Design a protein with these regions (language model features):
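Tandem repeat scaffolds
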Residues: 7-208
Length: 208
């Protein structure tokens, strides 16, 4: 049913998709408007260039899915598997990712504005060459977000909260950091070579 709708209409509008097996689905360039997706397998699916607006994904697998160049606005993802997702060059605005896993996820060259990552594991996630504006990373369960070995090299971060984040062995080499909050963050082994930091808050005694 969902596949037929996708083929006939090139996307979904106002639909609820639940308990569907859609792994490896080809949905490049598709349009998703006010869609609710629950307990659905979209792993390794191709959603490159898709336009996703005012939609919610819950308990859904997007492992190794391709979201390259996709556009998201007012999208919320709850308890989703985003491990190894390819979200390079993604454009996301007013989005929230909660209770999910996005380890080894790729956001290279992405533009994220007013985005929240809550209780989401981002170990080894890549944000290199990306633009992050008013992005919040938080995890009340762990005391701070999990971003060990994350890659922010060459990225531009503006008004970003990484308060109490675990950023051990993360790299910010060549990054531009404006108004970034690193208060109480764990920065052991983090690489700030060539980074420019303006108006940032770092842990006491730390100098990038």
């Amino acid at each position: 049913m969902a596949l037929q709708r996708l083929r006939d209409q090139g996307g979904f509008s106002g639909d609820r998709i639940a308990d569907c097996e859609l792994s490896t689905v080809y949905a490049s360039g598709s349009d998703w408007l006010q869609v609710v997706v629950e307990k659905t397998d979209l792993s390794q699916g191709n959603l490159a260039g898709a336009r996703i607006r005012e939609s919610t994904f819950a308990h859904t697998a997007l492992r190794k899915a391709r979201l390259r160049g996709a556009r998201m606005e007012r999208v919320e993802l709850y308890f989703c598997d985003l491990n190894e997702v390819d979200a390079s060059e993604l454009s996301a605005r007013r989005a929230k990712v909660h209770g999910s896993e996005a380890m080894n996820a790729v956001f290279t060259g992405a533009q994220l504005a007013v985005v929240r990552f809550e209780e989401t594991k981002l170990y080894r996630a890549r944000f290199d060459q990306s633009l992050l504006v008013r992005v919040v990373f938080l995890d009340s369960r762990l005391g701070g977000p999990s971003l060990e070995k994350a890659d922010f090299s060459g990225a531009r971060l503006v008004d970003v909260s990484l308060r109490a984040a675990n950023l051990q062995a993360a790299t910010f080499s060549g990054a531009t950091l404006v108004g970034v909050d690193f208060t109480d963050a764990a920065l052991e082994g983090a690489d700030f070579r060539g980074a420019a930091a303006i108006g940032c808050r770092f842990p006491a005694g730390f100098s990038p």
